[in-house]
Every structure is written in C-alpha cells, then in structure tokens.
C-alpha cells in the first residue's frame, strides 16, 4: 500500500510541478527614459500578469517615487526622470509587499479591499494577509 501511495504521489507531483514553476515567473519591467519623463510601456501587461489593478500599481509607483504619472492604455508615464535601477527597485518592493504570499512565496495572489484595509489572499495556499494601505 505504501509503494502504491508513493507512486501516485510522485505522479501527482510530476503533473503539478511544471505548472507551478511556470506560474512563479515574475515579468520584467521595461523602463525608457525620455526628456523630463520616464515611460514604462509594458505596465498594463505586468498588472494583468500579477493580477493587480493598473491604477493601484500606478499609485504605489507615484507615491514611492514622489512624482505624478499618467496611465494611457498599457503605458505608464512618470512625469520626471528616474533611473531604471530606481524604478526596478520600486517594482521589486511592490512585488514583495503586494504580490508575494508571505506564507508560501507564491505570486498567485489576489488583493481585495475589506473596509479600510487591503487583504492579500493566496490562491495557492489559501492564506489571507493584511497589507499596508496606500
């Protein structure tokens, strides 16, 4: 009975593991500097991939970088020059605070507002964690 169980468990892991690894890929952010502004052309695609509202992400970037910005379609424009390294650091901070599950480290999460607080619920392990409000 134990050998049969182990064989079934191995089979299940082989079927499930590749999907979980593929899901854990965090998209790269593209940063383009222009005179007096910084453009992120793949911002909407990142928001969809991370299952986050594009305006919520934009608000986080604006507050962290202390510059105004606009969202036009999938493109996010910051009205001020910021180096790509600084923008990437803010992106990593956003992922750490608002995307990655602190229990299982999965990015398969959703963010909901319950009253005055935001709650991040992991779709992989089911954990609910309150996060900092913006």
Swiss-Prot record:
User: Carries keyword Protein biosynthesis?
Assistant: yes
Mention any Pfam family matching this sequence.
eIF-5_eIF-2B
Q: Does the keyword Coiled coil apply?
A: no
Q: Which Gene3D superfamilies match?
A: 3.30.30.170
Q: Which SMART domains match?
A: eIF2B_5 (SM00653)
- Which is one GO molecular function term here? translation initiation factor activity
Q: Which UniProt keywords apply?
A: Initiation factor, Protein biosynthesis
Q: How does it assemble?
A: Heterotrimer composed of an alpha, a beta and a gamma chain.
**Protein role:** eIF-2 functions in the early steps of protein synthesis by forming a ternary complex with GTP and initiator tRNA.
Which family does the similarity line name?
Belongs to the eIF-2-beta/eIF-5 family.
How is this protein named in the record?
Translation initiation factor 2 subunit beta
Q: Which gene encodes it?
A: eif2b
């Amino acid at each position: 009975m134990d050998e049969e169980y182990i064989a079934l468990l191995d089979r299940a892991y082989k079927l499930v593991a590749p999907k979980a690894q593929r899901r854990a890929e965090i998209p790269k952010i593209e940063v383009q500097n222009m005179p007096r502004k910084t453009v992120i052309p793949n911002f909407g695609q990142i928001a969809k991939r991370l299952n986050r509202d594009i305006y919520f992400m934009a608000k986080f970037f604006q507050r962290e970088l202390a510059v105004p910005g606009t969202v036009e379609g999938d493109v996010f424009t910051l009205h001020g020059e910021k180096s790509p390294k600084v923008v990437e650091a803010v992106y990593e901070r956003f992922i750490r605070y608002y995307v990655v599950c602190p229990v299982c480290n999965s990015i398969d999460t959703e963010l909901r507002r319950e009253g005055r607080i935001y709650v991040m619920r992991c779709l992989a392990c089911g954990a609910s964690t309150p996060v900092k409000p913006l």
